[in-house]
Every structure is written in C-alpha cells, then in structure tokens.
Amino acid sequence: MKEYPSVTVIGAGLAGSEAAWQIASAGIKVTLFEMRPKKKSLAHHTSEFAELVCSNSFGALSSDRAAGLLQEELRTLQSIVINNADKYSVPAGGALAVDRSQFSLSITNEVSSHPLITIIRDECPCLPKAHQITILATGPLTSELLAKDIKEFTGEKECHFFDAASPIITGESIDFLTAFRASRYDKGDADYVNCPMNEDSYIKFHSELIKAEQAELKDFEKESANFFEGCLPIEQLAKRGIETMRYGPLKPIGIWDPRWGDVNDKSIRRLKRAHAVVQLRQEDKAGKLWNLVGFQTNLKWGEQKRIFRMIPGLSKAEFIRFGVMHRNTFIESPKLIEPTLQFTNRKTLFAAGQLTGTEGYAAAVAGGWLAGTNAALLAKGLDTITLPSSTMIGALTNFVSNSQASLRVKNKKNFQPMPANFGILPELDIRVHNKRERYKEYRDRALRQIKKLRETLLDKSSSPTNI
C-alpha cells in the first residue's frame, strides 16, 4: 500500500478530534497533540477529548432549524462527533443535548484506539515546519506560546471575546413542590425542570443580580471585555434592563404547571401564569445533574450560591460546578484563510473550529470535518474541496474565509464569531413566503448537495490513485 505523508493535528477538542478521525479514516497517519492534562486550560475540567466546556447542547435537533441542518449535514458525512452526540443524547425537548462525560470519554476511546492515530499528551508550543501538513484546532483556549507564534505567523493582532459557562446542580436538591417538569408549549416530553417566579421574586432577584460581585478580570482583559451576544453572562443581560431576561432565558411564554389549573381557562391563565421562568436542562443520562439554561456567569462563586438560591425551587441547590468566564481567542480568518480552510500563504497549514471564528459546537465539528478531509486529500496529492454555499457547512466556511461571501466582513474593524443561521445561505430559486416552509426548502437543497458531495468523496477514495 502506498505510503502518504502524515498529518499533524494540534488540539483534541471537537474540531481536532473530528479532523484526526477523518484523516485516519482516509488511511493517513495522524499525530494528535493535546496538552491536557499536562497543561490545563482555564475552562476545561477533564483531560478527555472533545470536552464540552459551556453548555451540553448542540442546539435545535430539527433539520428545518439552522443548528439542526448543520447536524444533519454532518451525520450524512459520517461525523464521529455527531455520531457520539446521538449515541449519548439526553432528553432536551427539541435540542440535541448530551451526557457530556460519556460523550467525551467515548470519543477519547475511539480516537485513541485508532491504529493510525498517535496521541502526544504535551503542549505544541509553535507551528510545525512548512512542509508538514498541519491542522490548527486549538480552539478559543489556545496556549500562550502557540498563540504568540500564530500571531507572528499571521502578522495580525489576535481577536477575542469572552465566553461563560452555566452552573450545574444536583437534581435531588431541586424542590419539586415549587419546580415542575414541562416543555415549552407542551411540545414533546417534559424534558425541562421549570422554576416559576412571580413579579415580586423576579424584581428581588434582578436587584441582587445587578449589584452582585463579579470575579476580577486580569488587567489585559479589562481593556477590551467584549462578549459574544449568543453567550452573554446573565448579569450582563440583567444590566440591560429589568425586562431583558424575561425576553431571553427567563421567558415564561408557553410554560404551564398543571397544578395551576386549566391552561385553556383564560381567567386562570391570567391569574396563575408565571412572571418569569428559570429552566434547567438535564446534563446526564441518569438525570442526576442539571444545568441552569442561559445562566452563563462571571459572578464570584459565593455570590452564585447566594443569588441563584433565590430562584424558587432552588433554595437548597447543591452546586456541582459553578459558572465561569474565560477569554476566547480567534484569528481574523477572512484575511487569512481560503474556503478550503488552508492558510493563503501556507497551503500545508489548515485552521479549524472556533479558532476560525465560527460559533457553536456543531460549527466547530464542521470545520474539523472539512479541514481533516482536505488535509487527507492534500496528503494523497489530490485536489482539496470546497463546499457549496447552499450548505450550512459551506456557508459558514465562506463567512470565515476570504471568499466572495465574506468580503463584506473583510474590511470591518471587528470581525466577530458567527453561529449557524439561515441568513448566511444564498436565496432560493423560488419565492417561499411562509418562513417554516422556506427553511424546509433551504434544508432540502442543502442535503441534496451534501449527498452529492458524499458520493464524490466515495469516488475519490476508490480512485486508483489511492491504491
């Protein structure tokens, strides 16, 4: 069998794990660097691969939603990460949420046991030599030494934003005399625990939250404490106005406790409905751990315990993990990388995952899949691929690359991370007025393209060039 150049992957997060697996599955040897546990990051709690440091949710599951379409594209492309997410999913209404411990452990075991993947548990302090095919998948918590080398290589100032994680509590510490199980609008199973607030308890909670003590930022962080809008700390939301949380994570619409009476009786509904509702989502398959949805925070731990125990039903909450905030680094990718995820000035170097400025777990996986697939093709001497912009993976890649689709971003001072959304897809050939039907058309078009791509890749893998 023909011997191909090996590929180095730096970082065993979601993108790096996916990339390494795709490369090895193509018959190429991989050296995978992961600095944990030898060197810990500010946000990770374990040394497992693909650890989820923020939420345990990959977003909406339905493929007529942007996040769900991205997941479905990755399923079609045989993503190891999405396969494990499906395997270790936990009830979460219409979302794909996972038992984060089992999920990460399974990916670690699968990747580590692949005969073509060599794991090096050490920091990679600098970029490998130019002849070595390399994927940078170090994520938003790139080590200082490597970040410095990347900065020197790109000649660009680093970009960053602040991200935060929600607290996790034990299920047995929830008071179900007040809290109750339900899903919004009673759709599907009652997968969420809901803690209702009346107007008085909400006002008191808001008052304490906006004056609570926050964990101190380092001096260099204070200068530019930018937050990503999709993951704002709850205290930052509260400071925007007393009603802001009620139109965000504490939205009460569509949530009803049967103990309050008949939801169809308007007089009862007006009298009993909650002013605000805090929701908790299951963290593990056994239902022993629950996270506070939307409660990313940078409050001091003592303040978290004091204030979050003000939530009805959580007065005796036992905290397994407190919320934390950390600095996320990403490159100004529209100036630096191609739609193949190769650096313009070094074709043997790829970037993948949140380092490129995509936002969300599935988007990181998508970057890992594309970078891994292209690195394997490059190692075999074959042409790399770009994905159609009508697919969610292709649209996200175009947004963070120097393609025509991202020229609108190229000259802006502040390039900011982008989550999966239908707004970045090109218009349909037909006019569809109904939004839900329009999203289904986007989905059908994207999945047709992805299936064609899958067939093309299968043809490439069976080509005589690869024997």
Curated annotation (Swiss-Prot):
Protein origin, superkingdom: Bacteria
From the Swiss-Prot or TrEMBL record, what is one GO molecular function term?
tRNA (uracil(54)-C5)-methyltransferase activity, 5,10-methylenetetrahydrofolate-dependent
Q: Which UniProt keywords apply?
A: Cytoplasm, FAD, Flavoprotein, Methyltransferase, NAD, NADP, Transferase, tRNA processing
- Needed co-factor(s): FAD
Tell me the GO BP annotations in alphabetical order.
tRNA methylation; tRNA wobble uridine modification
Principal place of residence: cytoplasm
Respond yes or no to whether keyword Nucleotidyltransferase is given for this record. Answer: no
The entry marks the following residues as binding FAD, namely 11-16
Offer a single GO CC term for the protein: cytosol
Q: Where in the cell is it found?
A: Cytoplasm
Function comment: Catalyzes the folate-dependent formation of 5-methyl-uridine at position 54 (M-5-U54) in all tRNAs.
Write the protein's name: Methylenetetrahydrofolate--tRNA-(uracil-5-)-methyltransferase TrmFO
What lineage is on file? Bacteria, Bacillati, Cyanobacteriota, Cyanophyceae, Synechococcales
Name of the gene = trmFO
